[in-house]
Regions:
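Pore domain of cation channels
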Residues: 69-134
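Alpha-helical transmembrane segments of multipass membrane proteins
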Residues: 49-57, 61, 113, 117, ...
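Cytosolic juxtamembrane amphipathic/interface segments immediately preceding
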Residues: 20-43
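Short, non-transmembrane cytosolic segments of multipass membrane proteins
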Residues: 1-17
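Canonical alpha-helical transmembrane segment with a positive-inside/aromatic-interface signature
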Residues: 120-185
Length: 290
């Protein structure tokens, strides 16, 4: 019976989900593992592979005592450093294989070493070239009257100094509901936004959903949302103007992240010189309505 995993995932909102019973296939999905592991663990992993690889071939060279000429330092560590030089194709000219067995081992090491280094280089390039979105989301969402109707408002900002072209936003409500048969299921509702597209997303973006009688949030309160295990998922996507790559970001909001009868602090001001200024130090600030 294959071994299974038990792993806890922490969502952007802080919500934790623990998964059990999935087959353990970490070694069959190394590409995804190395794309998602932290940089320190990645370098430690590559360093450990490099050390173990050369230890293995040093042990193979040790099977024949006179396989390497001018071995220095003598013994196992001399063979280890010869393996390092062979893997890197340095060719200092002092130590070299002098028997058929040593030549065969060195040839096999060069072949496997080139393949391994090519894979490592490709993985590093994939990590560096992977598009990342530097999108700042407000810590809280607010609900306030706007144009006579309660409106859910969220705020996002582009942390980079370049433009995200054709930015699109989608807001969804996830909550537990009961069917007419009494079966409890989790449903996802789309929450229409007043403006879900931005042709050029450079500074900030306030996203608004009007809680009309037809809205899935109509009549909702903090208590009902908690009872239904509800949360909001906001996703943003667009094209980086500099690289032409598609960017994606998401944020989740739990019921305790919603602030009723509050509004976002104004971060835009105009100085006496006529220049408009955006103060991102107040980006997360909210204010109660009078």
């Amino acid at each position: 019976m294959p071994s299974t995993t038990s792993k806890t995932h922490t969502q952007p909102s802080g919500r934790q989900i623990q998964r059990h019973g999935l087959p353990r296939r970490r070694w069959q999905d190394l590409y995804h593992v190395y794309m998602t592991v932290s940089w320190p663990r990645l370098f430690v992993s590559f360093g450990g592979f490099f050390f173990a690889f050369n230890l293995l071939f040093a042990a193979l060279y040790s099977l024949q005592a006179n396989g390497i000429a001018q071995l220095n330092p003598p013994g196992f560590w001399g063979r280890f450093f010869f393996s390092v030089e062979t893997l890197a194709t340095v060719g200092y000219g002092d130590m070299h294989p002098q028997t058929l067995f040593a030549h065969i081992v060195a040839s096999f090491e060069i072949f496997t070493g080139m393949m391994s280094l090519a894979l490592i280089a490709g993985m590093m390039f994939a990590r560096f070239s992977r598009p990342t979105a530097r999108i700042l989301f407000a810590r809280h969402a607010v609900i306030r009257p706007l144009d006579g109707r309660p409106t859910l408002m969220l705020r996002a900002a582009n942390e980079r100094h370049n433009v995200i072209m054709e930015a699109q936003a989608h807001l969804r409500l996830v909550r537990d509901e009961r069917t007419i048969e009494g079966y409890r299921i989790r449903r996802i509702h789309d929450l229409p936004l007043r403006r879900s597209e931005q042709p050029a997303f450079l500074y900030g973006w306030t996203l608004m959903h009007t809680m009309t009688p037809d809205s899935p949030l109509a009549g909702a309160t903090s208590e009902t949302l908690r009872t239904d295990n509800a949360f909001l998922i906001l996703t943003l996507s667009g094209v980086d103007e500099t690289t032409g790559q598609t960017l994606m970001a998401r944020q989740e909001y739990l019921p305790e992240d919603l602030r009723w009868q509050h509004t976002f602090a104004d971060i835009l001001s105009r100085g006496e010189d006529g220049i408009e200024r955006i103060d991102y130090r107040r980006f997360h600030d909210i204010e109660p309505l009078n």
